[in-house]
Regions:
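DUTPase catalytic domain/fold
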Residues: 1-178
Length: 178
């Protein structure tokens, strides 16, 4: 069964469940669970640039991750307060509203979000669905509880005939170290 549920920290909240607005809408509108400020991109860029300027060689992914972690310079995680139970062979694709970049200068940092069928109920974050946002404007932007931030679209996926993946998910974001 495919269904959205509130995560426990928002169980008593009056946030809207994701829903489609029209009969032919592919995506379920996802709302912001709590007020949050998205800092401007230049503040992230400036803090990264200062640390990266100490070297003239390209940085590895691990080096960038260490700088990012030490500076707490990363995209803003915007909670929907939701998790999603999915059938095997299905994933939930997240994208920002088409108006976000055009009208509000907000983009999804990872281009598209993928919620795997084994993400719900993981021990790190209960499978809470977040949008990773970057604010390209020169000023902070506040998102209010209930603002529609993006869409979730259910999609099937396929595996190769010789697929041998047997690991069990043990965490949330980045838990597979990919």
């Amino acid at each position: 069964m495919i269904k959205f549920e509130k995560v426990s920290r928002f169980a008593d909240s009056d946030i809207e469940m994701p829903r489609r607005k029209t009969a032919e809408s592919a995506g379920y509108d996802m709302v912001v669970a709590e007020d949050i400020v998205i800092p401007p991109y230049d503040s992230l860029y400036d803090s990264m640039a200062v640390n990266a300027a100490t070297t003239d060689k390209p940085l590895t992914l691990n080096e960038v991750a260490l700088i990012t972690k030490s500076l707490k310079a990363k995209p803003t995680l915007v909670s929907t307060g939701m998790k999603c139970q999915l059938n095997k062979g299905t994933y939930l694709e997240l994208s920002v509203r088409s108006s976000c970049p055009l009208k509000h200068w907000l983009i999804l940092a990872n281009g598209v979000g993928i919620i795997d069928s084994d993400y719900a109920d993981n021990p790190d974050n209960e499978g809470e669905i977040f949008f990773q946002l970057i604010n390209l404007s020169p000023v902070p932007i506040i998102l209010h509880k209930g603002d529609v931030i993006g869409q979730g679209i259910f999609k099937p996926y396929f595996k190769t005939d010789l697929d041998e993946a047997i690991e069990i998910r043990m965490g949330g974001f980045g838990s597979t170290n990919a």
